Regions:
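Accessory nucleic-acid engagement/destabilization modules that flank
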Residues: 1-191
Length: 192
């Protein structure tokens, strides 16, 4: 592993590393698997691939060496938003802090709302484009009611949070990530 490789995680003993690309790909596979239950596997994969691209920034790499905390989720949310995926953007933006309030166009970049965060200037993270190939943007299912869209976003969010947590936990424990578990097992048992 060369010194310019972007890292997502370092084991507590400092002997093992997980690259950002490895983490994004593993999380994407898990999120795709979980989201398949409600027909959103493409969106799950997309969210998993984008969720931590902010870890490619120099500021985050410095964080791994003891630097200050850094917002690494806004980068992926911005990329999803630029690609016409606002529901994935909400999901990615909140994968550590909870789904953000939407906000208003008058929100400033200092505010924690979704629209405020989309105005933030963030550290460059473009190295992701040479390591991660995004699939075509997923189509949004045809929703008849607004609550369906809200429910879809919350389900996708849950899939991403679980996938991210499970992949990170598996790396830290040096075990393969589990397939399913928790709410996924519950949903699969009731799938018609």
């Amino acid at each position: 592993m060369n010194s310019s490789t972007a890292l997502a995680h370092i084991s507590e003993d400092g002997l093992r590393v997980q690259t950002v690309a490895e983490h994004l790909q593993s999380t994407a596979k898990l999120c795709e698997h979980f989201a398949n239950v409600f027909g959103a596997e493409q969106a799950g994969c997309y969210a998993g691939l984008l969720h931590d691209i902010g870890k490619y920034s120099a500021a985050f790499q410095y964080r791994l060496k003891g630097g200050p905390k850094v917002d690494h989720s806004t980068a992926g949310a911005k990329e999803a938003q630029l690609r016409g995926q606002p529901y994935i953007a909400f999901t990615v933006a909140g994968h550590h802090t909870g789904l953000p309030d939407g906000g208003t166009r008058s929100d400033t970049d200092a505010e924690g709302t979704f629209l405020g965060r989309m105005k933030r200037k963030i550290d460059p993270y473009s190295r992701w484009e040479s390591e991660i190939a995004l699939p075509p943007s997923p189509a949004l299912p045809p929703f008849k009611q607004r609550y369906e869209l809200a429910f879809y976003t919350r389900m996708l969010y849950s899939c991403l949070v679980d996938a991210d947590y499970l992949d990170t936990e598996a790396f830290m424990d040096d075990t393969p990530p589990p397939r399913g578990g928790g709410m996924t097992v519950f949903l699969l048992s009731y799938k018609s």
